[in-house]
Amino acid sequence: MDKAGRLLRLDTLRRQQIRKLEYLLHDAKQQGCDTVFTYGATQSNHVMETATAARRCGMRPVVYLGAIVEPQPNDVRANLLLDTILGTEIHILPSCGRSTKETMEANDHLFQAHIAQLAAQGHKVYNIPIGGSTPIGAAGFAECHIETMAQCESAGLACDYLVTATGSGGTLAGLAAGAAMLHDDSTQLIGIQVGKKDPATYGQKIVELANSVLETAGAQERIDKLPFVIHSEYVGPGYEKPYKEANDDIRYLARTEGIFTDPVYSGKAFHGLMDLIRTGNIPKGSNVVFLHTGGATALFSEPDIIGDLNQIQA
């Protein structure tokens, strides 16, 4: 990898969600909420960060988790362990072969009943969807894009490509909104999918969210066509499901730069970046910013999530 590349790190323990949560929990405090609800997989980085931030803000975290990989009761690991240490109220739901989003949609009646019960007891709940991908949350990444371009300018770097992982879509939507605010059409945004999505609707939903960010921010700009490229070919077997090629690039980055990525998000995104470079889809000599979204806690999760990364090599 060309050493002239740039890496924007958003911490290797926590993920990019802290950008969203800065805005979301400010909104929760403004509304006088004392409880935060959110949702995700059992090893969700978003859930762990939300629980952490809620505690920092004096609010009680309540989470519903879809068990894509079933945790062992006597061997709680990684993000789920941190959720437990934080004293989070945890409800684990069987996934039954469904995606996390599908699991949550099927159980929405449970969440609404729980929220209503707490309201009857005098509590006020702030409800954050999967990934924190709302117009308020995604605004954190509009700010991120503006900051990143300012840093590139101060470094004398014209950014040709900005590459990041994309799951619930809030990160990419925020980046697109930030690019629109700057009238920046010289930087190609690339999202590397980490879970299987409907290609016919996924990109358009991100555009709609980006426009909602712009509207919420009071900006005049709007996006009328896809301002990014999304690659779905690096998902592998699915969300939270590792594969050899991605794990090989996780090792490569760790062994050449001492930088850790995870097998769920940033590792698949980095593998996608490397493959785009190797195949010439990102031309030699390009200036590339890789937005490292953290999440290294996944390296300590269940074997089904990390794959062959735990094999000791001579």
Task: Provide a role label for each language-model segment.
Residues 1-314:
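PLP-dependent amino-acid enzyme catalytic core
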